[in-house]
Amino acid sequence: LHAKHGVGKSSVVKQVSEEMENELGKSVGFWDVRLSQCEVGDIKGMPHLDVDSGVTRFLKQEWWPTDEDSHGILFFDELNRASKDVLQAVFEICLDRRLDGKKLPDGWRVVAAVNSDDEYDVVELDPALHDRWFHIDFDPTPMEWVDWARGNDVETACIEFINRNQNLLDPPVGNLEAGRTYPSRRSWVAFSDTIKQMGLIDSPESGMLTQVAKGWVGREIAVM
């Protein structure tokens, strides 16, 4: 999946796993692995000595499926923000469906997401990995987000605002200023959750509502 940050990549992949579960009538696993936060040991596992064989083996991470009859999705997010060592470990899973000799069960699918090339702090992927994937540009329209928001308990006031100001759903195109707060689909949902929890809708505490808006979706929107 190719998309801007905060567009809901992990949410839509998790939703797919839930739909698979309904279709199969059995449990379907879902693991969201944020590669930008991983070291190589977080992928390969921790080394330990197999006393019986005298060979060093790797203890697999919690997310590695061990049931051969299981189904699920391994979701590697922020693939193009991972370190080179982490990428090499992920390559083996993505290309060979194996990790240190352990086979990924046939019922599991591997999905990865990358942040758009126009965002900062991303690396160019090796062509050997790039051409092994089916690529999807994930860019739902603002109205598609509005439809999704209506079905996912997003505050009505937020939905109506985006319906009138569709250009303010996402951060602006181009280089973003470090340290500055911009709107994103993820931050709009977080803003919605916060104002509902604090009871700020139709509240006389308009100053507090403005401050919360600044913190989640940026100063420019907060003063509108």
Residues of each region from the PLM?
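AAA+ P-loop NTPase catalytic core and its hallmark functional loops
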Residues: 1-164
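Alpha-helical lid/collar subdomain of P-loop NTPases
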Residues: 152-224
